[in-house]
Structures are given as structure tokens and as C-alpha cells.
């Protein structure tokens, strides 16, 4: 017996050319939209994610010399660790997702130093963070076991996901970082500083009138020049404003107290340094951040390019400016600065000169107490000088004289704990 399947009769239908064209266009459109959505979700719909990592560097010598001028400087250890984490993820399968890392804390422990680092990645928002958290820890564990640069205990590695707001605030609270690229242009004279370019710059004001510059070194402390308080000594009439304009200020704080160096004497101009504590904590943002302080043992060579900022006058006898200005100058050697036609014996220990011997760019009235800064290879900025004194502004053979921060580093620490 043969089985016969039931068949349905068919009739051929010829599609017209225009209908075929429409179908092709529709098909291509669907494919293009699908690919576009896929690209959008895989490439463009990616969000920054922050992860807190910690591990221990096992070396008692680091702990013993922590903070001292020895083989392991804090700055070097921080840079070495950040470079190490960079290399680990750039050499991993997640190199396209990795953005950066930042060491936010180094804590001495009995057998070494605990490192806390914030790692920033970019992933599609659809993926599970818990899975990535474990993967990041796994990558760190595997790579660290084969490292020779630092004796890290691989079993001490811990990784935890952070909320975007907490991660960003933690990164912002780290010193010496800015979001605006360095302006390569070259206050007597200088140029107006872009918004958020120098987020540690502050204006010290007496009865709401600008008197001096100051530099933010924590969320409650600033560094400035002692001579700023020579005339007005009541802290309750002083305020500090932040931002690139004096009016309107981005943020304002009352002064709780200021501490002038005990050995400061106006006639000699030595020990021209003071610290200022504000009455309430400063809220960090892209526009307001703290700068790093160098170690006491750090040295900065003549001819190094540095940057000065301030609201001071544009010429000798002029008035302070509402807009923050910036200028690029160079450190001048003591040998040159102590020449008779320059400043001779007026240059004492704890002072240095910066600017140009031909004049041009210089600090001026109203810039006093403000910052002279430089950056390292990791683009971290350090306060190395405080605007102190000089003859006129931008005059030939009369560069600006600055208080040397490294000379007073231990004094700053003794007063502020920073």
C-alpha cells in the first residue's frame, strides 16, 4: 500500500520590479537599524563604572621609611602602583573597557603598606556588575602573582563595585587633578584662565574685598602668605571664595582661624607662610579641588617651567582683577637671583625666584599668597611656591620671589596634619 500525502495546489505569482525594490529596501533598512541599535548598545550606551580595589605591598622597609626621604617616596610608590595597574588592564582582555586608575590612599601597616585604588571602566549598561567585579579581582590576582616590580600579596586583593556618585567624589577628592587640559598659551600680563583650570585657587577677602590668593590643600585648609594678615588680624572678618571669578563666587566660606609662621617678621620677609582653616568643609567638584603638596625632600631644578595664577593687578599700581589669570614662568637659579643687580643677600633660605630676567610675565599686587605649581608625568599637580614679594611687577632683573613649600613642608604638616 502506498501512502499519499495530501498536497495543496500552488499558483505562481510574479512580483513586479518595483515591489522587489521595495522589499529589498525594507530588508536593508531592518538590517541597518538592527546593526545601528547593536552598535549603540555595545559602543555608545556604555557607562562609567567605578571599582574600589585594595591590596598590600609586603615590605617592612616601606613601612619603616613611610613619609621619609628614602628609597620609597610616597610619590614614587603612588606612581609605580598606578603604572602597574595600568599595565595589568591594558594587557588584559578588558583593555578596551579600561579607562584609568587612581591611588587614593596609602596606609602603613605592620608588614608593609595597604594600597587603596579606584579603577574606572566603561561597560554596556546591560551587563551585570557583580560578574564584572569578580572578573576584575580575578585579573588582578592572576597578574599580580607574576609581578616582580612590587612585592604584592595576591591573596590580599579585594575589589568592590562603587556607585558612580561615590566613585566620582572619591576621585575628585584626590589631590592635584584637574579636568581642563593645560592651556599652552603664555598677572602682569598672562591670560584669563579657563573655567575649572586651576580648581585649588582661592581668593582671600577682608570685608568681602579681595586681598590675597590662597591654595586649597584639603577640604578645610588653605596655604597662603603670612604678610596677607599683616594689617587685618580678625579672622571673623575674613572669607574665602572659590572659582575663576571673584564676583559672583562659585562658593564662599568663612574663615575659622589662620596660623602665621611663628618666626615671620615683615621687615626681613622670611617665613612668609600661613595656613587658613575655613569654618565648614569645602564641597569638591570639577571646579573646586585640592592640590598636592610635595615631600620635604623634593627638589625642583632651575629652568623648570611652572605656572602662576591670581586675581592680581596687570601692572604695577593697578587694581586686582575679577577674572583669574594664568601665566607660565621658569624657576631661576639662586646663583642668578642672588646677583647684586637682582636681589643680592635679600634671598634667604626658604625663598626662590621664578619668572624671566627680561621681565614680561610676573606676579603682581593682589597675587600674594597664591600658588606657583608644577605637574609630574602622571599629570598630578603640586604646590611648590607661594607668591611672596618682588620689586614692582614684570621689571627687568627683578623676577618674583616665592616662599619655598618644601622648606616649610614639615611646618605645614605640624599645623594642619596634611
Swiss-Prot record:
<protein>
    <recommendedName>
        <fullName>Transmembrane protease serine 11A</fullName>
        <ecNumber>3.4.21.-</ecNumber>
    </recommendedName>
</protein>
<feature type="disulfide bond">
    <location>
        <begin position="364"/>
        <end position="393"/>
    </location>
</feature>
<feature type="glycosylation site" description="N-linked (GlcNAc...) asparagine">
    <location>
        <position position="303"/>
    </location>
</feature>
<dbReference type="Pfam" id="PF01390">
    <property type="entry name" value="SEA"/>
</dbReference>
<dbReference type="Pfam" id="PF00089">
    <property type="entry name" value="Trypsin"/>
</dbReference>
<dbReference type="InterPro" id="IPR017329">
    <property type="entry name" value="Pept_S1A_HAT/DESC1"/>
</dbReference>
<feature type="active site" description="Charge relay system">
    <location>
        <position position="272"/>
    </location>
</feature>
<dbReference type="GO" id="GO:0004252">
    <property type="term" value="F:serine-type endopeptidase activity"/>
</dbReference>
<keyword id="KW-0378">Hydrolase</keyword>
<feature type="domain" description="Peptidase S1">
    <location>
        <begin position="187"/>
        <end position="417"/>
    </location>
</feature>
<feature type="transmembrane region" description="Helical; Signal-anchor for type II membrane protein">
    <location>
        <begin position="19"/>
        <end position="39"/>
    </location>
</feature>
<feature type="topological domain" description="Cytoplasmic">
    <location>
        <begin position="1"/>
        <end position="18"/>
    </location>
</feature>
<dbReference type="InterPro" id="IPR033116">
    <property type="entry name" value="TRYPSIN_SER"/>
</dbReference>
<feature type="glycosylation site" description="N-linked (GlcNAc...) asparagine">
    <location>
        <position position="153"/>
    </location>
</feature>
<feature type="domain" description="SEA">
    <location>
        <begin position="47"/>
        <end position="164"/>
    </location>
</feature>
<keyword id="KW-0720">Serine protease</keyword>
<keyword id="KW-1133">Transmembrane helix</keyword>
<dbReference type="InterPro" id="IPR036364">
    <property type="entry name" value="SEA_dom_sf"/>
</dbReference>
<dbReference type="GO" id="GO:0005576">
    <property type="term" value="C:extracellular region"/>
</dbReference>
<keyword id="KW-1015">Disulfide bond</keyword>
<dbReference type="InterPro" id="IPR009003">
    <property type="entry name" value="Peptidase_S1_PA"/>
</dbReference>
<keyword id="KW-0131">Cell cycle</keyword>
<keyword id="KW-0735">Signal-anchor</keyword>
<feature type="active site" description="Charge relay system">
    <location>
        <position position="368"/>
    </location>
</feature>
<dbReference type="InterPro" id="IPR043504">
    <property type="entry name" value="Peptidase_S1_PA_chymotrypsin"/>
</dbReference>
<comment type="similarity">
    <text>Belongs to the peptidase S1 family.</text>
</comment>
<dbReference type="InterPro" id="IPR018114">
    <property type="entry name" value="TRYPSIN_HIS"/>
</dbReference>
<comment type="subunit">
    <text>May interact with ZBTB17.</text>
</comment>
<dbReference type="InterPro" id="IPR001254">
    <property type="entry name" value="Trypsin_dom"/>
</dbReference>
<feature type="disulfide bond">
    <location>
        <begin position="212"/>
        <end position="228"/>
    </location>
</feature>
<keyword id="KW-0812">Transmembrane</keyword>
<feature type="disulfide bond">
    <location>
        <begin position="337"/>
        <end position="353"/>
    </location>
</feature>
<keyword id="KW-0645">Protease</keyword>
<dbReference type="InterPro" id="IPR000082">
    <property type="entry name" value="SEA_dom"/>
</dbReference>
<comment type="function">
    <text>Probable serine protease which may play a role in cellular senescence. Overexpression inhibits cell growth and induce G1 cell cycle arrest.</text>
</comment>
<keyword id="KW-0472">Membrane</keyword>
<dbReference type="GO" id="GO:0005886">
    <property type="term" value="C:plasma membrane"/>
</dbReference>
<dbReference type="InterPro" id="IPR001314">
    <property type="entry name" value="Peptidase_S1A"/>
</dbReference>
<feature type="topological domain" description="Extracellular">
    <location>
        <begin position="40"/>
        <end position="418"/>
    </location>
</feature>
<dbReference type="GO" id="GO:0006508">
    <property type="term" value="P:proteolysis"/>
</dbReference>
<feature type="active site" description="Charge relay system">
    <location>
        <position position="227"/>
    </location>
</feature>
<keyword id="KW-0325">Glycoprotein</keyword>
Amino acid at each position: 500500500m502506498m501512502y499519499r500525502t495530501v498536497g495543496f495546489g500552488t499558483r505562481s505569482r510574479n512580483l513586479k520590479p518595483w515591489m522587489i525594490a521595495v522589499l529589498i529596501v525594507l530588508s536593508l533598512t531592518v538590517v541597518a537599524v538592527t546593526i545601528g541599535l547593536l552598535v549603540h548598545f555595545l559602543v555608545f550606551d556604555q557607562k562609567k563604572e567605578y571599582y574600589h580595589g585594595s591590596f598590600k605591598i609586603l615590605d617592612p622597609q616601606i613601612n619603616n621609611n613611610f613619609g621619609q626621604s628614602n628609597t620609597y617616596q610616597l610619590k614614587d610608590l603612588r606612581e609605580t602602583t598606578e603604572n602597574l595597574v595600568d599595565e595589568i588592564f591594558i594587557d588584559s582582555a578588558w583593555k578596551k573597557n579600561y579607562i584609568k586608575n587612581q591611588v587614593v590612599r596609602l596606609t602603613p601597616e605592620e608588614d608593609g603598606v595597604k594600597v587603596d585604588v579606584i579603577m574606572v571602566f566603561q561597560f554596556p549598561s546591560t551587563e551585570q556588575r557583580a560578574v564584572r567585579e569578580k572578573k576584575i579581582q580575578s585579573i588582578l590576582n592572576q597578574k599580580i602573582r607574576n609581578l616582580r616590580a612590587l612585592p604584592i600579596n595576591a591573596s590580599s586583593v579585594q575589589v568592590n563595585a562603587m556607585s558612580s556618585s561615590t566613585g566620582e567624589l572619591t576621585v575628585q577628592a584626590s589631590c592635584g587633578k584637574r579636568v581642563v587640559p593645560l592651556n599652552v598659551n603664555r598677572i602682569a600680563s598672562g591670560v584669563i584662565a579657563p573655567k575649572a583650570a586651576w580648581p585649588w585657587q582661592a581668593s582671600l577677602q577682608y570685608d568681602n574685598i579681595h586681598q590675597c590668593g590662597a591654595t586649597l590643600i584639603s577640604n578645610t585648609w588653605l596655604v597662603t602668605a603670612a604678610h596677607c594678615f599683616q594689617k587685618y588680624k580678625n579672622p571673623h572678618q575674613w572669607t574665602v571664595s572659590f572659582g575663576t571669578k571673584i564676583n559672583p563666587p562659585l562658593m564662599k566660606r568663612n574663615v575659622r582661624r589662620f596660623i602665621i609662621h611663628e618666626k615671620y617678621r615683615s621687615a626681613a620677609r622670611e617665613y612668609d607662610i600661613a595656613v587658613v582653616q575655613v569654618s565648614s568643609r569645602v564641597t569638591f567638584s570639577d571646579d573646586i579641588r585640592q592640590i598636592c603638596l610635595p615631600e620635604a625632600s623634593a627638589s625642583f631644578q632651575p629652568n623648570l617651567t611652572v605656572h602662576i595664577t591670581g586675581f592680581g593687578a596687570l601692572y604695577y599700581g593697578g587694581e586686582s582683577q575679577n577674572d583669574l589669570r594664568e601665566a607660565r614662568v621658569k624657576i631661576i637659579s639662586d646663583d642668578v637671583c642672588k646677583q647684586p643687580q637682582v636681589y643680592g643677600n635679600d634671598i634667604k633660605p626658604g625663598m626662590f625666584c621664578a619668572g624671566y630676567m627680561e621681565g614680561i610675565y610676573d606676579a603682581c599686587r593682589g597675587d600674594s599668597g597664591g600658588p606657583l605649581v608644577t605637574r609630574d608625568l602622571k599629570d598630578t599637580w603640586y604646590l611648590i611656591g607661594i607668591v611672596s614679594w618682588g620689586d614692582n611687577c614684570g621689571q627687568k632683573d627683578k623676577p618674583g620671589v616665592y616662599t619655598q613649600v618644601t622648606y616649610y613642608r614639615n611646618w605645614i604638616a605640624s599645623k594642619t596634619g596634611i
